[in-house]
Amino acid sequence: MDKSIPKATAKRLSLYYRIFKRFNTDGIEKASSKQIADALGIDSATVRRDFSYFGELGRRGFGYDVKKLMNFFAEILNDHSTTNVMLVGCGNIGRALLHYRFHDRNKMQISMAFDLDSNDLVGKTTEDGIPVYGISTINDHLIDSDIETAILTVPSTEAQEVADILVKAGIKGILSFSPVHLTLPKDIIVQYVDLTSELQTLLYFMNQQQ
């Protein structure tokens, strides 16, 4: 992907993909920027600006070809082939994610999970067929795998140490649910999911409306 694309635009790519998949399922062949914008709750100028980073995706007055754009975003997001990811941390959030069927919506799947060697799940397989291993064996299990992405759901006090282990094992991208900033090499991509912060932000905006 072109590194000059703004982060805000990049974060909307999966949303565009989801919308075009829905349009396709509904039998819609052409969609205007307004239809797309209304479906996402943004303005049509933002849609047109986002799409402009990728060249000529549609013709003015004719709308956007739904199937073409669906395939276009699938290609950008690498959703034509299955992407295996790993999960580290089988606490409450981790266990919930182990039961979440990513592959029902996109071609992503958690193919293995890790926790402290003493965790009662280690050595077992989940109902969905995901094996759970001890964290001391990460290198052994990653060496022959195609996994480059990890979901991190460990306590904040352990996040940096575990992230360092993942990077040394060859992980290139981390989705972290731990509310601490990770200090990692610049070529490692990290996305943060801070549920507490998001809820506090929601409550703030709700209070502002009162």
From Swiss-Prot:
Chain residues forming the annotated DNA-binding region: 15-54
Keyword Phosphoprotein annotated: no
A Pfam family matched in the record: CoA_binding
GO molecular function, one term: DNA binding
Compartments, record wording: Cytoplasm
GO biological process: one example: negative regulation of DNA-templated transcription
Primary site of residence: cytoplasm
GO cellular component: a single term: cytoplasm
Keywords: Cytoplasm, DNA-binding, NAD, Repressor, Transcription, Transcription regulation
Binding site for NAD(+): G89, C90, G91, N92, I93, G94
Gene3D superfamilies: NAD(P)-binding Rossmann-like Domain, Winged helix-like DNA-binding domain superfamily/Winged helix DNA-binding domain
Subunit architecture: Homodimer.
Function, as annotated: Modulates transcription in response to changes in cellular NADH/NAD(+) redox state.
Entry similarity comment: Belongs to the transcriptional regulatory Rex family.
Protein name: Redox-sensing transcriptional repressor Rex
Source organism of this protein record: Streptococcus agalactiae serotype V (strain ATCC BAA-611 / 2603 V/R)
